[in-house]
């Protein structure tokens, strides 16, 4: 039985742990930070469109930190690390994915050496998110694969230990390196362990990079715009200069720029997805993740969703006027959030940013 550690106990992470637990093909551990005491004592209250209402639910093991999960007396090593935290590469150093998973990789190496391959599944947004892992953990020192998880799920933590899931869980899982046979096998195994027939929808993804560029049509154009204005998508569409102005003047140009950047990388994204993403969000009164993060005063996944694609565009000579406006404005919003958290300091006497 595979041992799986899920890191991130928000709406996505808890439903991920629940789905694995219900399938009964893995031993599931969950890192629960802020809600640890509450969940340890009372478990989770979950209202799920896939699984119904659960009271007092817990996975097989819960830990208050990744370090505790790695150093637990009964830790025999984890076969899978599933990362569902936000990917904030411009945030505090200790929140970078490589630093989050390091204690587990180090412990696995100590316990098993080269005999255990750790499969790192990144259920996160953005493009080029795998490169940090490959850069920080040399293959000659660590034995691991890196897997991609692209999840569409309307799941939110609405209170301490309280999860609401309103959209069916759709997960596609594949290997970032399409030539890595071990990663491909691990992705297929995870699909099997995660699939609860008739409840969630899970599939193996043979074209990870294509899928990630495709999802960026939504994230880079729609998710970002809602964060700037603090509105759900239907209101963005209805509150425009006219009924078509937001999609025609903002959403669609941004999406076409993503298509052009992807094409410069040899990835062809069909134009029909522009209409598809607009239409499926038109009647969903649901605030996307960046909008929610901004309203909660939390840092947004700005760099992996907008920064990385724009850097690729500059490298490949692709014009991105709409994306660049969105990005530069959101950099200011992100800086405001950082200042409130004490991550940036502004000297009002000199009207300059203080270097630390």
UniProtKB/Swiss-Prot annotation:
It comes from the Eukaryota. Gene3D superfamilies: N-(1-d-carboxylethyl)-l-norvaline Dehydrogenase, domain 2 (1.10.1040.10), NAD(P)-binding Rossmann-like Domain (3.40.50.720). It is found in: Cytoplasm; Nucleus. Keywords: Cytoplasm, Nucleus. One of its GO terms (cellular component) is cytoplasm. Its main location: cytoplasm. It holds the Pfam family ApbA. SUPFAM superfamilies: 6-phosphogluconate dehydrogenase C-terminal domain-like, NAD(P)-binding Rossmann-fold domains. InterPro entries: 6-PGluconate_DH-like_C_sf, 6PGD_dom2, KPA_reductase, KPR-Related, KPR_N, NAD(P)-bd_dom_sf. Present with 5171 molecules/cell in log phase SD medium. This is Uncharacterized protein YDL144C. It comes from Saccharomyces cerevisiae (strain ATCC 204508 / S288c) (Baker's yeast).
